[in-house]
Amino acid sequence: MASKFFIVHHTFKPGMVEKWWDNMKNYDETKQKIHLDNQTEAGVYCHTFMPTAKEGPMFCIWEAKEGVSDSEFQNFIDGPNAIGVHMDLDHPLNNHCQKIDHDLIGGEGPFPRRF
């Protein structure tokens, strides 16, 4: 079995739009490294972040290594190591995670596999 990909649909919780974007200005190399280290430890990786408008929604393509269950992935996205936490925000996003059916796209993911 190989890694799997997810598309994550993010929407802002009430009152979080301005706080999110203000804090993104402070998302420096140190915070990025912490977030990437947490991803590595959890066996997940965000390939791309795609905001559609300042007010949202935002979409991301994530990869989870073999052995990471769907619920473990959702728990990471919603949990204490989510990006918003490292921006000094308390869980600013609602996150709908949808696994991509690799069989429908020829067995490969939308990006070259990291795992």
List where the protein language model places each region.
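Short S/T/G/P-rich N-terminal loop/turn motif that feeds into the first structured element of a domain
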Residues: 1-57, 63-75, 93-115
